[in-house]
Design a protein with these regions (language model features):
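Anaerobic metallocofactor- and corrinoid-dependent redox/one-carbon enzyme cores
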Residues: 1-150
């Protein structure tokens, strides 16, 4: 959030994606892993166009993977020049999520993540796409405004 020592949370979301054989959506838990943190660096869902074959694991189409990478540019401050996307003219992956851009556009970061079983100890039962709740960004904007007197 750019506010040291502060985290803004919201309700965990359901991951949407293919399940491994023998599992069904009602077996899955909510997204509570650390995959969202990787998105702040620009890897994972933000970089889907770098490896469109990932759709075989997380679901969707190659076109959607490319669109996710393009769309994330609308809510970030820049690009990471250390990780480039050949399919998009070697642009850097979108990096540094801007809470105000999320707030004004309504576009939520896209996250590639594992689907964990709802029962502890079972492990990964699929993979998919999830978005953090908008409430996280609303709270972050309010916290930022309070901190900086805006």
């Amino acid at each position: 959030s750019g506010l040291p020592g502060q985290w803004f949370t919201g309700p965990a979301q359901q991951v949407i994606g293919p399940m491994f054989a023998g599992y069904k959506p009602e077996d899955s838990g909510l997204d509570i892993g650390d995959s969202a943190i990787t998105e702040t660096y620009g890897i994972g869902g933000f970089a889907m166009a770098t490896a469109p074959a990932i759709v075989a694991l997380v679901g969707g189409t190659v076109e959607e993977a490319i669109d996710f990478s393009r769309q994330m540019r609308e809510i970030t401050l820049g690009e990471n020049p250390n990780v480039t996307i050949p399919l998009l003219g070697f642009m850097g992956v979108p990096s540094a999520i801007d809470i105000t851009r999320v707030g004004s556009s309504g576009i939520l970061p896209v996250i590639n993540t594992a689907i964990a079983h709802k029962d502890a100890g079972v492990g990964m039962i699929g993979a998919g796409i999830v978005h953090p709740p908008f409430a996280c960004f609303e709270k972050a904007i309010l916290g930022w405004c309070e901190r900086y007197g805006v």
